Amino acid sequence: IAPFPLKLSRDRVTNENAEITFLEPNHPILNYPNRITAKDFEGWKQEQGLYYPNEWDKAFTPILASNDKGESPKKGALLVAKYGKGNYIYTSLSFFRELPEGVSGAFRLMANLISIQ
């Protein structure tokens, strides 16, 4: 499913209010067209994410991490790799739950994902 090695796990973050860690806060994917902050993860519904990768090629840059209380951080919440003339993005975040619920932060982040150059 990816142009570079990426191993998915069954890991998930079940607490929709789990704190997000910004591993690369200056990365364009978090800053254009919207500046993504912790506020964009407020009001998420049900679980925050699932099928977090636990191994990936060095071509990927981990952007976000998250974890349930008492668990180790899952740094594969959002991975970006340059590929050809564009980018390959893998995300574990539960957009399929957040977008239908109208979570504004999910829409803001999705706009950034499709706008990356």
List each model region and its residues:
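Catalytic beta-strand/loop cores that center a nucleophilic Ser/Cys/Thr
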Residues: A2-S104, R108
